[in-house]
Curated annotation (Swiss-Prot):
The active site is at K186 (proton acceptor). The gene is gpsA. InterPro entries: 6-PGluconate_DH-like_C_sf, 6PGD_dom2, G3P_DH_NAD-dep, G3P_DH_NAD-dep_C, G3P_DH_NAD-dep_N, NAD(P)-bd_dom_sf. This is Glycerol-3-phosphate dehydrogenase [NAD(P)+]. Gene3D superfamilies: N-(1-d-carboxylethyl)-l-norvaline Dehydrogenase, domain 2, NAD(P)-binding Rossmann-like Domain. It catalyses: sn-glycerol 3-phosphate + NAD(+) = dihydroxyacetone phosphate + NADH + H(+); sn-glycerol 3-phosphate + NADP(+) = dihydroxyacetone phosphate + NADPH + H(+). It comes from the Bacteria.
């Protein structure tokens, strides 16, 4: 089986390394400098010290990725629609499975990643690959556990069989929407938790904030799906609780580190400048705006997401923001 991975950032490169022992892997980047660097050194500047195996073929032209059996998308959510359109223009075959490893909500439409793919590539089956996974550990082939969410049980079982390895434990879920909501919101919550930790408000406040975060996941899920309950396996499994624990407790998390800098800066932190200077994508920054707008559209209250949004986009005071987190 040949798998194409779209996006050669830290996450995409890590997945390529992780799967290279069992699959033929194509790693695509739109960035010519990145392409030339990886081709020359077999190393990514996003994952220094991790050699990219020779059986990972690096490509610059997206048309060279379309003959794979499955495609894993590891691009920023805000770029997903553009990449899907490029594949559509390359006549991607309809039986090629799209596996989404990106997390977020599209700002312009307030759609989840699977909804974007269904619009642009309606004939391709979609699955979600999500859970607690730091890129550097995945690249080193350390053990990790993820959820593979798909509405087609047969396809889900097939993909798990192909992707699962000795160090990768995959759990099947049919809750495509719930898994994506957890994946998107946890980055916003990580920024909030980083602020609390940066302000040295203690682990009691931190734990309370993580607990409140799970309630906001539930609130958005119920409103978006018009359901009366959320799948408990989603809420307490790797995709939600597992990812929250990891992303909201370790400074290896880009989003937590971003929030920590805000909390420890004594109101002197320039979020926009930090984003423009950094090499990493802070998905929680974009998702805070998307989540706030989606909550407004659905007429629901999501106080943590709203507080992070108002701090980052409307210059709310850090004191007012923290009062929401610990109140």
């Amino acid at each position: 089986m040949t798998i194409s991975i779209l996006g050669a950032g830290a996450w995409g490169t890590a997945i390529a390394n992780s799967l290279s022992g069992k699959q033929n892997v194509i790693l695509w980047t739109h960035n010519k400098t990145t392409f030339e660097s990886i081709s020359r050194t077999r190393e990514s500047d996003k994952l220094l010290g991790c050699q990219i195996p020779e059986n990972v073929s690096v490509k610059l032209a997206i048309k060279e990725t379309v003959n794979a059996s499955a495609m894993i998308f590891a691009v920023p959510t805000q770029s997903l629609r553009k990449v899907c359109q490029q594949l559509h223009d390359c006549n991607l075959k309809k039986d090629v499975a799209i596996i989404l490893a990106c997390k977020g909500i599209e700002k312009s439409t307030l759609k989840l990643p699977s909804e974007i793919v269904n619009e642009v590539l309606p004939n391709n089956p979609v699955a979600i690959f999500s859970g607690p996974s730091f890129a550097i550990e995945v690249a080193k082939k350390l053990p990790y556990s993820m959820v593979l969410a798909c509405q087609d049980d047969t396809l889900g079982s097939k993909l798990i069989s192909e992707l699962q390895q000795e160090n990768i434990k995959l759990h099947f879920s049919s809750d495509v929407v719930g898994v994506q909501i957890c994946a998107a919101l946890k980055n916003v919550f990580a920024i909030a938790c980083g602020i609390v930790l940066g302000k040295k408000l203690g682990f009691n406040a931190h734990a309370a904030l993580v607990t409140k975060s799970m309630n906001e996941v539930k609130t958005l899920y119920l409103a978006k799906t018009d359901s009366v309950s959320i799948d408990i396996d989603t809420l307490l499994g790797p995709a939600c609780l597992g990812d929250l624990i990891m992303t909201c407790t370790s400074l290896n998390s880009r989003n937590l580190s971003f929030g920590f800098k805000i909390g420890s800066s004594n109101n002197s932190f320039d979020a926009q400048q930090t984003l423009s200077e950094g090499k990493s994508v802070i998905e929680g920054f974009s998702t805070a705006q998307s989540a706030f707008n989606l909550a407004e559209k659905l007429k629901i209250k999501m106080p943590i997401c709203e507080a992070v949004y108002r701090l980052l986009y409307e210059s709310a005071s850090i004191e007012d923001t923290i009062s929401v987190f610990v109140g």
